[in-house]
Regions:
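Short hydrophobic segments within beta-strands
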Residues: 9-10, 117
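Hydrophobic positions in alpha-helices of CheY-like receiver
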Residues: 101-105
């Protein structure tokens, strides 16, 4: 039986940035990211199409310019919003780009199931360098939930995952309070794999 293919769209939390202690805006990308661990959890092939620092509008440009191969994808996961730009009260360019990205992917990967993922926990603790991301991540979470309902696509609400919280930030997000480290990405993949098995038992029975 051929391995299932999961394409992972996103920003630094997909690409696998661990962050740097006490510093903001410096990439520290590692191989052991959530797609790496998800492949092991589900015994599938994952393709990591994450790009650090991108909002939805910037990611749409990147997607269109790079001809990312989606043709044989069984599942496409989209986890964007950490870098802001979204609003639930007015139309913004990132809002429109996020919705357009879904449509483009549905066209490019006709057999794929699309899963939207809310950005996961960001600390509010000012001791961590990237705590300030929390404000726009909260808006993005609400935006993604709304889009999943409007577009009738699957949603993994990572923001509600109870294992990621203000207590465990010192374990899973210990460098900057935003990016995860190896243990965090592994736990994220475990959570995602459980949800994917619930959604698609016929694929991962």
């Amino acid at each position: 039986m051929e391995k299932r293919v999961i394409c992972c769209i996103g920003d630094s939390l997909t690409e696998g940035d661990y962050g740097v202690y006490g510093v903001t805006g410096v990439a520290n990308v590692h191989e052991k990211n959530y797609p790496y661990f998800l492949a092991k959890e589900l015994k599938c092939e994952t393709r990591n199409y994450g790009r650090c620092g991108l909002r939805a509008d910037q990611y749409l440009d990147y997607y269109m310019e790079n001809n990312l191969d989606m043709s044989d994808a069984d599942i496409v996961m989209i986890m964007l919003g950490t870098n802001g730009g979204h609003s639930v009260t007015e139309d913004t360019v990132p809002n429109e780009s996020y919705k357009k990205l879904i449509k483009v992917i549905q066209k490019d990967a006709p057999k794929a199931k699309v899963i939207l993922v809310t950005p996961p926990h960001v600390t509010a603790n000012p001791e961590f360098a990237n705590h300030w991301y929390r404000t726009h991540v909260e808006v993005s979470v609400e935006f993604v939930r709304n889009v999943a309902e409007q577009e009738d696509v699957y949603l993994i609400d990572a923001a509600k995952y109870e294992e990621f919280n203000e207590e465990t930030v010192k374990i899973y997000q210990k460098n900057d309070g935003l990016h995860y480290v190896e243990e965090g990405y592994q736990e994220m993949a475990r959570f995602f794999s459980r949800k994917i098995k619930e959604f698609f038992p016929e694929m991962f029975g």
